Amino acid sequence: MRSIAGVAADLAAGRVSSRELLEQALARIADPSGEGSRVFTRVHAASARAAADAADASRKAGVRLSPLAGVPVSVKDLFDLAGETTTAGSRVLRQHPAAAADALAVQRLRAAGAVIVGSTNMTEFAYSGLGINPHYGTPQNPWARSAADPLQGRIPGGSSSGAAVSVADGMAVMGLGTDTGGSVRIPAALCGLTGFKPTTGRISTQGALPLSFTLDSIGPLAATVACCAVSDRILAGLAPDVPEALPLQGLRLGVLRGYVQDGLDDAVGTAFGHALSTLSAAGAQLRDVSFDELKNIPTYTAKGHFSAPECYQWHRQLLQDRQSEYDPRIAGRILKGRDVMAWEYAELIHLRQRAMQDAARAFAPFDAWLLPSVPLIAPRIAELDGSDEAYGKVNLAMLRNTSLFNFLDGCGLSLPCHKAGEAPVGLMVMAMGGHDERMLALGQGIESALRAAGCAVAV
């Protein structure tokens, strides 16, 4: 994996052209021994070549360019691209009319000169944290990949599965994803990437197919925190500056205990413990936090969270007409929303507001909270693909920690904290909503300490 800053430096120095970078990415996508056919639902080669050539021409003419200019980027296939049909990883939408305009997030990427390589595969309608897709195939996690039998490979995490693997496999430098319950942070954790979930509303969802209008947020998956920071600012319509890294000396980091650490795989527990020791040795002040309200949130959301009723409203007619074309596991989750009563939805809004107030008070003494992004290492695709029980159990486990902070409208990162050669493990660094810039600055300081300790932070 390469960082945006590294690629931009090579482009500026003339060591490589945007067209050369793009052709390398397209070759990886087309490689029959690779994951390209499962990573992308569509490849936009012609428009990407035009964008790469335009970036090269501007650079040659001495035009001042953004850090993303001429850089290959992938876009999750729930963002509208003008002239293309948005499928959201489903067969149901294949024959729908093409989008009349780009989603606003895509408009901002194009305005910054990014080269949109293609639309990436995802969990159907973004409604699972596993990344399994029966319609377009499931991209294999880069860790412990099986060349002989893709089902013996490991899940990439979801729902932004293709976005993650596109970056991990060098098909893109940044992948644009969405995070409603963890769909950026889960695949980032399982694939050894960095993923950023911003405060809801920081980046416009205009032109993005919704899962939950209450919870949907848009975020990048990339190699480093700086990559996420510059991408986030471009997506938010801000100047593409990277905040200066915060030194760890004296930072107050709360380590969440209890519910969020139940049932950790040994590899996750070991990597998380090593990360905590590393940050403490670097001068951060770590203190255990027991915020009991977290374990109550799954009870509040047991009937389908905000996602089920809000998603059902969007899908109601499609399900009546074409339910047989849905992945049954996804259709079943959406249909839970049919049974949510108005008073239950209103009560959930009230419970969320109260939980956010309680969380803000508990968070006040800290600069960030730390916890494992997910409790498990990536299981094999075959273990989940053939068992509804296993699928449901692991999906709940994968979403457990990340979804808490969608409910609380936090902002934060998943950073790789494993050693090279080990199963990827993510360290989640979270803050309350509205602290995005400080979170990205703090994340760079944490990333530097982890890198110095030999953790597998890509550069």
Question: What does each of the following model-derived ranges do?
Answer:
Residues 1-49, 57-60, 281-282, 452-459:
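An N-terminal boundary/leader segment
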Residues 8-9, 57, 104, 315-407, ...:
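Serine-dependent amide/ester hydrolase catalytic core
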Residues 12, 111, 169-262, 273-282, ...:
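Structural helix-boundary/capping segments
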Residues 15-23, 53, 103, 267-290, ...:
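Acyltransferase
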Residues 25, 48, 228, 253, ...:
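Residue-level signal for inorganic ion chemistry
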Residues 55-72, 246-254:
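Immediate post-signal peptide segment of exported/extracytoplasmic ligand-binding proteins
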Residues 68-215, 258, 371-391:
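Short glycine/serine-rich loop/turn segments
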Residues 68-91, 153, 250-252, 305-360, ...:
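Short helix-loop capping/hinge segments that flank enzyme active sites or metal/cofactor-binding pockets
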